[in-house]
Amino acid sequence: MTLSLEQLSARMRQGEDVPLSDTARIALALSIPSILEQLVVTAMEYIDAAMVGHIGAEPPAAIGIVSSSTWLLHGILVGLYTAFSIQIAQYLGADRRQDARGVLRQSMLFNLILGLGAAAFGVGISRFLPGWLGADISLQADASAYFAIWSAALPFTMAMGMYTAMLRATGDALTPSLISVLVCVLDVVFNFFLINPTRQIQLFGQSVTVWGAGLEVPGAALGTALSTTIGGLLALGVLLLRDGPLCIRKPGSWRITSACLRNLWRVGTPLAAERAALSSAQVLLVRIVSGLGTVAIAANSLGVSAEGLCYMAGYGIQDASIALIGQAVGAHRRDMAKRFAWLCTMMGIGIMALSGAGLWLFAPALMGIFTADAAVIALGAQVLRIEAFAEPMFGASIVASGAMQGAGDSTGCFVLNLFSMWGVRLTLAFLLAPRLGLVGVWAAMCIELCIRGALFLIRLARGKWLDKGALQ
């Protein structure tokens, strides 16, 4: 019988020795729903990208121009709200449930204030952003509309990400996965009607008229905004209605505490800075790619979507590692934290090695899902096969960073990611792009991911990431 995370935390607090078989089972129990969720999310993104890609090369290029900016803005917000879920995991590990519920309440106030501010900022700059990024004039209107609609939904996007992360911190990986899968399905349904115009389709041998808004790129953004809004409301509803360690119907204060703010500053600020560093580097990479032509822009954008099949499994395991290490650190069990960290990291390396092999084998077929443009397919398949070799070490960096974040060592993650992205990837891409085009950009990415993985494994082995200790 597999232990629940709550039972494991109780045994850790009592100083019991938990067998390796039990720790492996609970790691799998938390990882598998998250991995399946990420794979379904990626599959839905494939369908989403294919719906836009089959319109032509320009629509995915328009989305690709602003995609790095969506990563930047969303990444900063993710870094900040991840600090709340780390606090909750550590408080639950220490059996401080009232403190955990207090953090949840404060996170709701944070989400409301920062979410609305981020939405206003994104909508405000959307008109000018594509021009700043060097987009061709023919792409700017669609790119601007996409970013504005996406930004308007940020409060709900934040709510979904924040509250599902908190549910995972309690050991409930299934409910967040179900919410995410539903959101992806709704996204595809909304896109089906919003992207395409009214048309005739064949259904069981009969010609049927299907209504469509014909919005193309803005329709894709609107479908995403509507589906994430529903997801955010569902996640909030679970926390409001379910009786559990984070049930906010139980008595508690909504007062913002100095301890929560200190922990948010200590953990959240480096995480937000890390996301900003990674995403701003992506913005500069898009600036480099945007000068390589529409085919390269489309191949780059769709190639990133195709690669998601590999690394999303790593992020699923990362979700589990944050919860597991967070609770182990909260229970003051460094030995268990180390065990979970290495167990999850090895799982990430193994799964992403297998998916990397699949990426190399099926690269042309994957690109063919997204677009019918032969030039985009050929270039996209070429760069995906380069990237396939980096997947195992990418997995190491993803999961090891999650383990370190769960322990509160967000500063170490920030430094390693800053060096690898800005010192290695951007430098190599700048040097190789003029000579090799998009192939040079992706070769730089492959080299950098291998170096990043090695750096994270070295830090994991040294153990200094555990010196941060439990939160206040």
Show where each model-derived region lies.
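Alpha-helical transmembrane segments of multipass membrane proteins
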Residues: 46-50, 128, 162-166, 188-193, ...
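Short alpha-helical transmembrane segments in multi-pass integral membrane proteins
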Residues: 1-34, 88-155, 186, 202-269, ...
